[in-house]
Amino acid sequence: MATKRKASALNAAVDDEPVDPSDELAFYCLGGGNEVGRSCHIIQYKGKTVMLDAGMHPAKEGFSALPFFDEFDLSTVDILLISHFHVDHSSALPYVLSKTNFKGRVFMTHATKAIYKWLIQDNVRVSNTASSSDQRTTLYTEHDHLSTLPLIETIDFNTTHTVNSIRITPFPAGHVLGAAMFLISIAGLNILFTGDYSREEDRHLIPAEVPKGIKIDVLITESTFGISTNPPRLEREAALMKSITGILNRGGRVLMPVFALGRAQELLLILDEYWETHPELQKIPIYYIGNTARRCMVVYQTYIGAMNDNIKRLFRQRMAEAEASGDKSASAGPWDFKFVRSLRSLERFDDVGGCVMLASPGMLQTGTSRELLERWAPNERNGVVMTGYSVEGTMAKQLLNEPEQIPAVMSRSAGGVSRRGLAGTDEEQKIMIPRRCTVDEISFAAHVDGVENRNFIEEVAAPVVILVHGEKHQMMRLKSKLLSLNADKAVKVKVYTPANCDEVRIPFRKDKIAKVVGKLAQVAPPSDQDDGRLMSGVLVQNGFDLSLMAPDDLREYAGLTTTTITCKQHITLSSASMDLIRWALEGTFGAIEELGSNERSKVKEESTKAVNGEQEIKEEPADEEIPMEETQTYLVMGCVLIRYHSRTREVELEWEGNMMNDGVADAVMAVLLTVESSPASVKQSAKLKHHHHHHSDLELPNPHAHQGPEETFENLLMMLEAQFGSNIAPIERPRIPSGIRANRTTKADPSVSAAVKTKSDAAGETPAESQEDESTEEIEAAELARLQALGIPYPGIEIKVDKHVARVWLENFEVECANTVLRDRVRVVIERAVETVSSMWGEGHPAARASNGTQGNKEVAVSKSNEIEARA
């Protein structure tokens, strides 16, 4: 019973051509698939492997926070690229370098490495001292982190580096200081990995831009916000200030959980600028607390050149103010805030009155921000303002739902004594803290929203898009939106949303392009009109780059030295003459070139020439003259030299060793080794002996004499198809002899033209055209009758080999072809076919028959033409 096919199966395009596994791009998602956190991806193409990011999940602990490293052999990774310093993108790097079999090279930007050093060091300390579990697994130590720092290599934006035939180019991503998008090129396939990126104009970062003049084949991009749209920047800044001032006006404290570096610096610029324009707020302090806050601010002051024009303008302005005041100790940098104070820890914090506190970490899992949350949450006058993205499973995400209580993880007594490990037992886990503070969310996360991300994807115009770094529902909404845009596109975009541990394989067949250099670059390339002209040279591959050059240029352009290997082979034949050898070689290779022989006169002439400018030396007469051996030399296919020594019947082959010449030499040796035993050679040898011995006039019987013209023609086609393929067809229309065409053009009777004019006008033809068509048909019919009387079934045969066409006229076996190589080859094959199959249409050699038996028949055709013209 027939089953109904799915519509997708009926509409799917069928591609029967198999795909080479090396032509497939493999994408493995070890983390960050359908989730935000522990970003880690693997791309493989043409035997090259690149790892993108190595982060940890902020909502998990121990090995569960790591990407799924066990699913992939990290020893095969060539390059590891870190997009930026955030923990969900870089904090697993010390584990990879110190605890796995990773052997590749690691790259990040200068600013990323500078901040990464302090950020990961602080993260290790906080994780080991403030944990929600008594049995926390230590993934790596501070020593592991510091010892692996020298393994990290730094690169600049907009610079291209080639590592193991992989080209990488970082571009500004606009997410945080040093954040980079990476363009990866492998064997001509361009892959753009955005990491976390932002296209929004802010106060200190350069927004991300599409790489100019580069065709992107695969785009790997974040999908953090899906298709959600953020309000304009000015509206969000106004809402932020309104929320903060509202909390302060009611006598409360403002807690802003942020990452120690990144958005915190942008928020500090906004607050410092607002406080400067509002004197009534200047009595309220702004605190920026964190173990690495002060040290990392030095990094921001160092890399002002990597920031946007706003920071550079502010830097020049404050430098001018400092010079004008004459006080060299005055603050002159854009990161020297007037109203922001840095705190190392809460030990020196006097928690009295209103304030604005920026504390890390941003997810409120542990650390200073969690301790302040537990301290301020019971007071309804206080407020929490969330400005970053909140990951699923974290306290920050739970707080957005405004729960009535929160679990106590960090706690301090009134005297400032710390109680550690509150969540270590079941009894301590029951301790809950009431939440009465307000919770506001105003997004300043430096991620593209739905509109910005979609516009960027459209501008890149990559045929393949892979979405990562996004919750499943956000990712699927963005995928649906992108697929809905395919209706107006000629080339449909493929969108992939792999989950963790998923593998995506995408076929890419890239054309191999070779760059012509050296002497060959000065030769004009062959045009379409050139008949089979080829450009030959040496193809050199360096990684995935191909260069075509002349052998003489190998040392200069490829750094290679060349060695020519001359091969020689000696074969001794018992009875074959050079005539038989040449006949056999021409039957296989077509026309061969004769280079001459070393006759004694030439040798004597060379020996009597003056030496070093001296006079000719007079030779003494010899007592006995030894006959000089004559050597005949021929060149086969322009590469194999054959020397035949007639006295010893030794054949010497010499050629320059390479793949092409070796094949030709093998074929020549195969012909020579069978020349004395093959049936065709025996027949030819008997014919040659018969011509030389005139005492025997007995003719050999023709085994094909009983064949008719049609059978003979079929045998001829069979032999031609064996040599040139099946694209052979008979020619139906004969050639009109040149003598008949001349008579038709020179003899023209005006009275006949006038008589025919009235008939041709009715038919819509001119008299000359009508008369010419009728006479041509009758002449062709007479020519066909003449050929059939000779036993020739068709005027000729047309042979097509690739784009070349050869025509063989069977009356005299004349070959017409624009390509000289094919013409000579067809001529030799026709002669061998005639001699092997039968005597064709008459007795004797084809050329002799054409000259002896054609003249009378042509005279009959000419007289027939004259008769037609007279009758007309």
Curated annotation (Swiss-Prot):
It comes from the Eukaryota. The active site is at residue 447. Residues 686-695 have a biased composition (Basic residues). One of its GO terms (biological process) is mRNA processing. Zn(2+) 1 binds at residues 84, 86, 175, 196. GO terms for cellular component: mRNA cleavage and polyadenylation specificity factor complex. Its main location: nucleus. It is an enzyme of class 3 (hydrolase). This is Endoribonuclease ysh1. It comes from Aspergillus fumigatus (strain ATCC MYA-4609 / CBS 101355 / FGSC A1100 / Af293).
